């Protein structure tokens, strides 16, 4: 009896101890103290939840990642110091289910995959208490304040300080420094380090990425076989390593709900950064993106301005802002991605098995079968002698075409990550020839040297031209059109590598899609971990896009709209593409005027010696990134415009002296013998006659794309240009295909501070206007932008007109919805989220429409207006501040030819 009572007392005490420990873990989101709790004997008749708690208590404060972990879903092992929890992914080192975060399952093509992945992650993470909104004590959450660290870590209270990790912990693991053995020991031995708060923007001189002490390498935590491990990589190996590291780390660690929970914190951080940025730059050469110093074609005239600071790097800040906006859009739309129509997603998924039957995507006559027949899906743990997927028509593999502006560089990655069961083609649209301001006739009559300073005062005309991806031709036959034979030249994966191997390229050129792939696995060390979409690491197989470097800069106006060609010769991973001896005349370079992550030119050698193990890790990580986004393809073709020869000759006659020879054709414009002012003259011609004659031509054949989404570009185009762009989209879509568009208004709606006299609401607003003076100042800036937009032929409220344009072009089944976000609410989380979205668009339009800081709107100070606006409204609700509207349109192309 005595022993039974003692046992009951012990059980009751332990139960109370478990309750307190569990509550502390959930409320603080931190590991418990290092006290070792008493060992508890599991009761045979206990239920699953109690058994889980007893096992956690029996294991003490945590096991390391390298220890043997149970596969039982009832057990969740945590580390005492949560070394993996301090990783950039912010996830504890627990054993994940086999299908969680794994690439093979996340990239499945069943109909539920598109919407279930994000829900699965949220549900799984909420069970272990990672989500802030599941806790009762928000004050102690690691997300709610500045970055924190464990007691034994070197704590740094400055959130902008760079994070470092001891580099000698890498490469000393079991198996002679092998990849998996070393990383397991790294997770085991790694000291706790500072946790980064994804809801705060870093300083311009710091980095979100984890760097080694030497600064030559970065570290990333990725999920391998259901366990998070740390990989060290060389950022100079691939210029996109840093950007992909930041992108994946944010998406794996943060959920759409965070955009609401931390809306106030994000808004404050954004306003603080924006104020410092505008005060330091004083609107000199303001244009999105913020990272202007990394634009490849900025010339010496720009760098002479006092506000230009080459030491400031806003690339990671800009990337994080884009990720915040994409996340908030998903939350506001309650969708899995900014591809907002779930019905269209279901139709595209249903279409996949039927439309791909003609390609006969079967494996050769062996007993081994690959469960998912979709091309380019990486099969994990595949043997070297296993059959490979066959090649199918690359154009048939495109499900969604994203047409985006140049500065939205993460849009394609985000859509591919959020819609893993659909194949995404990313095409950057350069509409600068349509947006050239031809009103300044005096400037057009000046020579090139006189024109440059004048054009530099108006950045929205200047920046899009520098490094322009536009190409103007005189004959429709000169337009490059993507097809099955040349797709291997213009399609790239997320790591800027050719999407096809040489063998696949040769077979595609023959249009033979049903033969097996024969490769020698002995000559390819990555044969077991590489799909057809991943080029091998050999020097004869790897082909990358040409990366712009400082050595390739030319004069911006001499190079104006000049057709360039990419270098297609085979290079190794460590060879700069800019020194390729072979140049193809059939493709254009991959120009990135808004490059996010700055890195040294590929021609510069790293100061450290690369080991064989490090090269292996770089190659492995590159392939891992491509497998993670294996449904992403980038179309590396310029935006092509057709200018008729008659118009071109007449414009040249007006712009050139009689004794000057005529301009050469666009085909030969890349020749070294071309005239210095050729690009400038072509730009003048386009500026003068573009509104009537310049015709856009998308590089896709008619009736080839199942669905097209085109956000963010409509506010820059007039009504007639809407029709021209929609006609091209209509032509490219297959019968029965879909077109989606997103467009915001250029000004705030329903604000009563500028209402008509006699209106009761306007009089009430004006009577209380003394409380919110910055709202009236904000409306003055919108009025100035509206006048500028009207002068350029733009619609102030495109949400009222774009739907009609879809109907005029020939689309049917048009569905539209307007999302109205109330502004002026600085008292609720939803109000802060609305303000963040509206303030971002306000800032973008202000710097784009009114770039000249010397003449701001009357009685306004745009440099400090954003901060004053927030400080005046914080904790209050301005009922008369109006609302910010965004239109979402989805339309279908008729299945039968449309006749009007």
Swiss-Prot record:
Which residues fall in a compositionally biased region of kind Low complexity? 63-76, 103-127, 528-537, 570-601, 665-676
Biased-composition ranges for Basic and acidic residues? 1-16, 30-58
Q: Could you tell me which Gene3D superfamilies the record lists for this protein?
A: Vaccinia Virus protein VP39 (3.40.50.150)
Coiled-coil intervals in this record?
none
Q: Where is the composition biased (Basic residues)?
A: 129-143, 543-553
User: Which segments carry the region annotation Disordered?
Assistant: 1-84, 103-160, 512-556, 568-613, 648-676
Locate the compositionally biased regions of type Polar residues.
17-27
Task: For this UniProt record, give its keywords in alphabetical order, as a comma-separated list.
Answer: Phosphoprotein
Positions carrying Phosphoserine are: 105
Protein origin, superkingdom: Eukaryota
Q: What does the further note read?
A: Present with 623 molecules/cell in log phase SD medium.
Q: What is this protein called?
A: Uncharacterized protein YBR225W
| Protein's organism | Saccharomyces cerevisiae (strain ATCC 204508 / S288c) (Baker's yeast)
């Amino acid at each position: 009896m005595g022993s039974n009572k003692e046992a009951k007392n012990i059980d009751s005490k332990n139960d109370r101890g478990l309750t307190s420990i569990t509550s502390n873990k959930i409320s603080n989101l931190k590991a418990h103290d290092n006290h070792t709790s008493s060992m508890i004997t599991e009761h045979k008749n206990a239920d699953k939840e109690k058994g889980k708690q007893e096992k956690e208590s029996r294991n003490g404060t945590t096991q390391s990642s390298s220890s043997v972990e149970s596969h039982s879903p009832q057990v969740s092992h945590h580390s005492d110091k949560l070394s993996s929890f301090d990783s950039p992914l912010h996830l504890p080192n627990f054993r994940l289910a086999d299908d969680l975060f794994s690439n093979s399952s996340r990239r499945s093509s069943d109909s539920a995959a598109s919407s279930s992945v994000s829900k699965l992650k949220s549900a799984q993470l909420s069970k272990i208490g990672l989500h802030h909104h599941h806790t009762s004590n928000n004050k102690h959450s690691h997300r709610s304040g500045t970055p924190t660290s464990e007691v034994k870590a070197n704590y740094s209270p400055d959130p902008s300080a760079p994070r470092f990790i001891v580099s000698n912990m890498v490469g000393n693991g079991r198996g002679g420094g092998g990849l998996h053995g070393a990383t397991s020991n790294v997770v085991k031995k790694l000291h706790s380090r500072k946790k980064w708060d994804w809801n705060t923007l870093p300083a311009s001189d710091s980095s979100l990425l984890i760097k080694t002490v030497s600064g030559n390498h970065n570290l990333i935590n990725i999920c391998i076989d259901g366990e998070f491990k740390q990989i060290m990589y060389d950022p100079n190996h691939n210029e996109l390593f840093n950007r992909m590291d930041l992108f994946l780390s944010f998406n794996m660690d943060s959920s759409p709900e965070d955009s609401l929970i931390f809306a106030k914190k994000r808004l404050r951080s954004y306003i603080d950064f924006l104020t410092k940025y505008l005060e330091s730059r004083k609107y000199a050469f303001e244009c999105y993106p913020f990272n202007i110093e990394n634009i490849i074609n900025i010339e010496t005239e720009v760098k002479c301005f006092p506000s230009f600071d080459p030491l400031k790097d806003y690339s990671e800040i800009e990337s994080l802002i884009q990720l915040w906006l994409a996340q908030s859009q998903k939350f506001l739309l309650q969708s899995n991605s900014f591809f907002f129509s779930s019905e269209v997603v279901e139709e595209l998924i249903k279409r996949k098995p039927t439309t791909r039957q003609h390609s006969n995507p079967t494996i050769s006559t062996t007993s081994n079968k690959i469960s998912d027949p979709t091309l380019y899906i990486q099969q994990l743990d595949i043997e070297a002698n296993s059959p490979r997927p066959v090649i199918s028509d690359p154009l048939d593999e495109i499900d969604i075409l994203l047409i985006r502006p140049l500065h939205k560089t993460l849009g394609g990655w985000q859509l591919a990550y959020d819609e893993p069961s659909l194949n995404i083609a990313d095409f950057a649209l350069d509409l600068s020839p349509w947006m050239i301001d031809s009103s300044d006739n005096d400037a057009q009559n000046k020579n090139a040297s006189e024109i440059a300073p004048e054009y530099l005062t108006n950045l929205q005309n200047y920046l899009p031209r520098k490094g322009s991806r536009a190409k103007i031709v005189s004959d429709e036959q000169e337009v490059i059109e993507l097809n099955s034979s040349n797709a291997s030249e213009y399609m790239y994966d997320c790591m800027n590598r050719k999407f096809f191997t040489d063998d696949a390229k040769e077979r595609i050129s023959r249009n033979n899609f049903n033969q097996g792939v024969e490769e020698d696995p002995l000559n390819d060390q990555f044969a077991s971990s590489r799909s057809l979409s991943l080029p091998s690491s050999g020097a004869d197989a790897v082909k990358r896009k040409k990366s712009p470097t400082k050595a390739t800069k030319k004069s911006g106006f001499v190079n104006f709209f000049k057709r360039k060609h990419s270098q297609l010769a085979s290079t190794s991973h460590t060879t700069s593409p800019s020194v390729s001896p072979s140049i193809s005349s059939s493709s254009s370079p991959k120009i990135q005027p808004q490059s996010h992550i700055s890195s040294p030119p590929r021609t510069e050698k790293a100061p450290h010696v690369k080991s064989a193990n490090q090269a292996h890790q770089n190659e492995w990580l590159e392939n891992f990134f491509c497998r993670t986004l294996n449904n992403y393809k980038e179309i590396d073709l310029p935006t092509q415009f057709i200018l008729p020869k008659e118009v071109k000759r007449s414009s040249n006659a007006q712009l050139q002296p009689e004794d000057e020879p005529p301009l050469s054709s666009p085909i030969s414009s890349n020749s070294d013998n071309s005239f210095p002012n050729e690009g400038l003259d072509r730009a003048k011609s386009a500026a003068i006659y573009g509104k009537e004659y310049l015709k856009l031509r998308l590089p896709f054949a008619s009736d080839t794309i199942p669905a097209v989404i085109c956000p963010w570009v409509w506010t820059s185009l007039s009504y007639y240009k809407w029709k021209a762009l929609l006609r091209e989209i209509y032509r490219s879509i297959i019968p029965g295909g879909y077109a989606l568009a997103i467009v915001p208004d250029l000004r705030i709606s329903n604000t009563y501070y500028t209402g008509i006299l006699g209106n009761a609401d306007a009089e009430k607003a004006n009577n209380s206007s003394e409380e919110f003076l910055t709202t009236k100042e904000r409306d003055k800036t919108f009025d100035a932008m509206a006048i500028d937009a009207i002068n350029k032929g733009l619609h102030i409220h495109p949400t009222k007109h774009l739907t009609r344009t879809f109907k005029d072009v020939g689309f049917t089944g048009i569905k539209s919805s307007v999302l109205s976000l109330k502004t002026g609410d600085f008292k609720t989380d939803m109000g802060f989220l609305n303000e963040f979205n509206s303030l971002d668009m306000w800032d973008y339009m202000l710097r784009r429409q009114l770039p000249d800081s010397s003449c701001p709107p009357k009685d306004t100070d745009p440099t400090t207006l954003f901060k004053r606006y927030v400080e005046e409204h914080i904790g209050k609700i301005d009922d008369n501040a109006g609302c910010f509207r965004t239109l979402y349109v989805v339309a279908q192309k008729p299945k039968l030819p449309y006749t009007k």
